């Protein structure tokens, strides 16, 4: 995904567009799961963490600073959740 496309999706998600947020999830679900798996070393825990991460992201998307990369933000949420 290009940075420009990601920025458009984030902007739409911040405005309440669920389809845009769903696309962000699809684009980042593998990396979130893999980071959680590396940190937790257990696949079921990594799945649970992934769900929690995207729930936190959804609840806090309004606070996301669009000058930052969404991928960096979601990675940080993942690391903090683990």
Functional labels for PLM-detected ranges:
Residues 24-28, 32, 78:
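Hydrophobic/aromatic residues within well-ordered alpha-helical segments
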Residues 14-15, 41, 54-69:
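Sigma70-family region 2
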Residues 10-11:
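Amphipathic alpha-helical repeat scaffolds
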Residues 26, 47, 58:
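Conserved catalytic core of two-component sensor histidine kinases
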Residues 34, 48-55, 68-80:
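Structural recognition of an alpha-helix C-terminal capping motif at a helix-to-coil junction
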Residues 2, 14-23, 33-52:
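Short, charged helix-capping/linker segments at alpha-helix termini
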Residues 32, 39, 57, 61, ...:
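Hydrophobic recognition helices of helix-based DNA-binding modules
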Residues 4-7:
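Acidic, Ser/Thr- and Pro/Gly-rich low-complexity regulatory segments
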